[in-house]
Amino acid sequence: MRIERVNESTLKFYLTYTDIEARGFKRDDLWTSRKKGEEFFWSVMEEVNQEEDFFFDGPLWIQVHAFDKGIEVVVTKSKNDDLQLPEDDSDLNIDEKVNDFINNSMHSDSELRDLLMRASEESTEQFFIVHFDDLEDVIQFSYHNYEDVDIEDLLYMYEGKYYYYVEFDDHMSEDAIHSYIAHLLEYANETQISHEQLDEYGKIVMSHNVKRQVKQYFKQ
């Protein structure tokens, strides 16, 4: 999850569908289940609050935008009634206001739901999982990867090893995928561990373009 502090009262964060699934939710849950959508939103807001000290002690205005790879959420805190809430909502508490907004915004746009459902049904994504012996191998791979492509990936820590999950969508050619994997195996080893096992027992260290993040934190 990427978080951007727009100003004192507004935050923007982006989650890939891999990020959403890593938190125990399915992408369709957000659009077809009000309860799941609310659970997901509040769990993410707790993470955001811990990282950015973004306390939500009043009315919130939430905008949710869906893209091919994930969702972007913009959260704005109402300050001095800058955000004009309907007068008949005055007796609602913050949870009810936010939940009503989420429900209305997610269920009023049928075209958006149809797009997400089709994307889920038509997806032909391939994935590959490897493990690195130590962090140094992760760093070397990140710096010597010949292609800096924008992909969905996750770096897990599980039983003292670093596991790298990479997802290729149908826009990448078979040759490009094979080349990427071949280069990856110069620094890592194949594994029989499943993505479900990593999700359940592993800890996500980095998500969404792991290589760029590694290069950001470990300068050479």
From Swiss-Prot:
Ranges annotated as spanning the membrane: none
Gene Ontology molecular functions: protein-macromolecule adaptor activity
Domain of life: Bacteria
Annotated function: Enables the recognition and targeting of unfolded and aggregated proteins to the ClpC protease or to other proteins involved in proteolysis.
Subunit structure and binding partners: Homodimer.
Family the entry assigns: Belongs to the MecA family.
Recorded domain comment: The N-terminal domain probably binds unfolded/aggregated proteins; the C-terminal domain interacts with ClpC.
Protein name, entry field: Adapter protein MecA
Organism: Macrococcus caseolyticus (strain JCSC5402) (Macrococcoides caseolyticum)
